[in-house]
């Protein structure tokens, strides 16, 4: 099950701060989804994913951004 952080309405760097706080609670192979409206959020949250060694994908929609950080499975590196 994915963990969702609703950071809509928060200005950067707060979406990235909230994402970093949530990392520890995500099990291997699962995803952390950050919902954000700040246009800089994809850049900051991508840096959080890179620092953690997790994969990252950003999707723009009518409500803002859906940013997905996926924790690697145990014993597997994150996809590049």
Language-model features, listed with the residues they occupy:
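C-terminal structural segments of small proteins and small subunits
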Residues: 46-80
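Amphipathic, hydrophobic secondary-structure cores in small proteins
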Residues: 7-59
